[in-house]
Design a protein with these regions (language model features):
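N-terminal, active-site-proximal structural segment of metallo-dependent hydrolase catalytic domains
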Residues: 1-75, 166-171, 175, 210, ...
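Eukaryotic beta-rich interaction modules
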Residues: 2-6, 26-41, 84-92, 114-118, ...
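Active site of divalent-metal-dependent phosphoester/diester hydrolases
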Residues: 80-108, 214-221, 229-266, 275, ...
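Active-site beta-strand/loop signature of hydrolases that rely on acidic residues for catalysis
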Residues: 20-26, 41-67, 102, 134, ...
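Surface polyanion/phosphate-binding segment centered on an Asp-His-Pro turn
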Residues: 135-174, 263-384
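Short catalytic/ligand-binding loop motif for oxyanion handling, primarily in non-cytosolic enzymes
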Residues: 29-31, 61-66, 115-116, 154-158, ...
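A long, amphipathic alpha-helix that forms part
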Residues: 167-202
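Structured beta-strand-rich core segments of catalytic domains in phosphoester-bond hydrolases
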Residues: 59-154, 271-273
Length: 384
């Protein structure tokens, strides 16, 4: 099963859909050049048309001098806006090298960034980097929080660099807690926050590497308890079948995405092992954008790349063909002539011409929207 698709591979992303990808990255190098894993990640983001990318275990000490490239810089290269929230364990950053196990991060691309509330987007307050969040705020009061978290894998060794040992040391040194398991602490702290965010009105999407069976163990049960958090395991619910192993050498479903009932899923699947960049399977979830930010007209956007570019002949051709087809189908040239010949008063002529002009503007916008896709991954713009 680990070499098969669970669910149905989504096609080209439709209008009104937000596509979220999630996976355990199993480490990403910080360099821009010669970085095959980063290049593959950008290719996947481009090919799948991702709006949100959730990664855990990026394994970077973000304070190390060699990790000078931020996530926005690493994943920029296309034409869409990029925003990111990334976290790691800051308490041991000065005592280790550029590699640090654990860490979580979220990336957002394109028009959806207009709804991103950066001040409301949070990181793990302990500074351990156990989770990151992005908050979307719509104009109608609807807001959705996306969470990416990593529950540490149990380790019996005391003095090593695993996330479990890092968090154990933090509890002993900073909280004088010598007994609580970091995994229990993760579950308690995240569960408390999820309740608080929900009470504040947030709709929630939770992407986790639970490092335990999400159906039978404590963390998954906490998330889906109908008398408690009441989250929905998105892939299993949508496909009607519980998910199988998510780690390429494992036998259990240890990763998952959970949503609140007011988030509408239009497709959900898990790709085979090896499809993504890490050693866990890649999740692809399509969500109705209106269920994340509410209905209504799009927000005013910052100046960004336009789809219509006259230096690209194939784009101009596609734009012109689409526009001319709509002009013919809706008889706008004939209607313009009728406006002049069929009205006897100036106001009548003006009213009909304005209607024709309004229709032509709509057709021009539609033609531009369909003439090409904006890239959000590694392929830099080139007029060739």
């Amino acid at each position: 099963e680990i070499l098969q698709i669970h669910g149905v591979l989504p096609g080209r992303k439709e209008e009104g859909i937000t596509r979220l990808l999630y996976e355990n990255a199993n480490g990403i190098h910080n360099r821009l050049g010669g970085n095959e894993k980063l290049d593959k990640a950008k290719d996947l983001i481009n090919e799948l048309g991702a709006d949100v990318m959730a990664y855990n275990e990026h394994s970077q000490n973000l304070r190390h001098k060699d990790n000078r490239n931020g996530r926005n810089q690493l994943f920029r290269g296309g034409e869409a806006d990029v925003r990111s929230v990334v976290a790691h364990n800051v308490h041991e950053a000065d005592r280790i090298g550029r590699v640090q196990e654990g860490g979580t991060g979220l990336l957002m691309f394109g028009p959806l960034t207009e709804y991103l509330d950066m001040p409301g987007s949070e990181k793990d307050a302990t500074g351990l980097g156990r989770w990151t969040t992005m908050l979307l705020k719509g104009g109608t009061g609807v807001q959705t929080r996306i969470i990416c978290g990593y529950n540490p894998c149990r380790s019996n060794r005391q003095n090593n660099g695993t996330s479990y040992s890092q968090q154990r040391r933090y509890q002993i040194w900073h909280q004088q807690d010598h007994t609580t398991c970091p995994r229990v602490k993760f579950r308690e702290d995240l569960g408390k926050l999820l309740k608080e965010w929900r009470a504040a009105g947030d709709r929630l999407i939770v992407c986790l590497d639970a490092n335990e069976n999400i159906y039978t163990q404590a963390l998954g049960k906490l998330l889906t308890d109908p008398e408690g958090l009441g989250r929905i395991e998105a892939v299993g619910r949508y496909t009607g079948k519980k998910i199988g192993p998510t780690y390429f050498r494992g036998q259990l479903p240890i990763d998952g995405i959970w949503t609140t009932p007011d988030v509408t899923v239009s497709n959900a699947c898990i790709m085979p092992a090896g499809y993504g960049i890490g050693d866990h399977r890649l999740f692809i979830i399509d969500l109705h954008t209106a269920s994340l930010v509410g209905p209504g007209p799009p927000r005013e956007r910052r100046a960004a790349s336009r789809r219509l570019n006259t230096r690209l002949p194939h784009v101009v051709k596609k734009y012109t063909e689409n526009l001319e087809e709509n002009l013919r189908r809706h008889r706008l040239i004939e209607k313009l002539g009728e406006a002049h010949s069929g009205s006897t008063d100036r106001e009548g002529v003006r009213s009909k011409i304005e209607k024709v002009d309004e229709n032509s503007m709509q057709f021009m916008k539609h033609a531009e929207k369909k003439c090409r896709r904006l890239k959000s991954g590694r392929i830099s713009f080139s007029p060739e």
